[in-house]
Amino acid sequence: MKILAVNRELKQPINDFVGVDVIPDSAMIQDGKPFFVPDFFNQWCYYAVLAFRVSRLGKNIATKFAHRYYDAVALAVRTSPVVTMPISTAVTTAFDGAFICGAWTQIDKLNENPRISIGDKSISISTANLLINDSVAYLSKYFTLKIGDIIIPAKISIESEIITDTVVVGK
């Protein structure tokens, strides 16, 4: 299992110049296990993301068929250090605990514009802006998608000082 994260903001288009982080399954925390801030950097940033679970094997998937290749969505958090010098992407994105995954919800139970709340901050997300089908097509050009893989189509920016509780409303 691997986690493929497209490095783009919510409203940015997907093109051949967008970066992709490949995150190993060892970086994932799930099932309510605690997260501890690592001590190898002083400052950390957190990105809320919607993660999509791949449900079938595929390679070179056309955008019009991409919806057949994922079956569930979860709210997740990507953790990365704030760095001012060039450093290996693996160190900043693939360490143990870099990806915190919530409970999976069947994709058909999610409405068109889910709302994500973090503490007292909230944002509505247009699923059209996520470009999940475009992300599946783009990623499958370079990677074989396997059952259980996770795709993160975009970062979701919510200004908040401390993440205390996260909820997806609209399922």
What is each stretch, according to the model?
Residues 1-150, 157-171:
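Catalytic-core "active-site belt" of small-molecule-metabolizing enzymes
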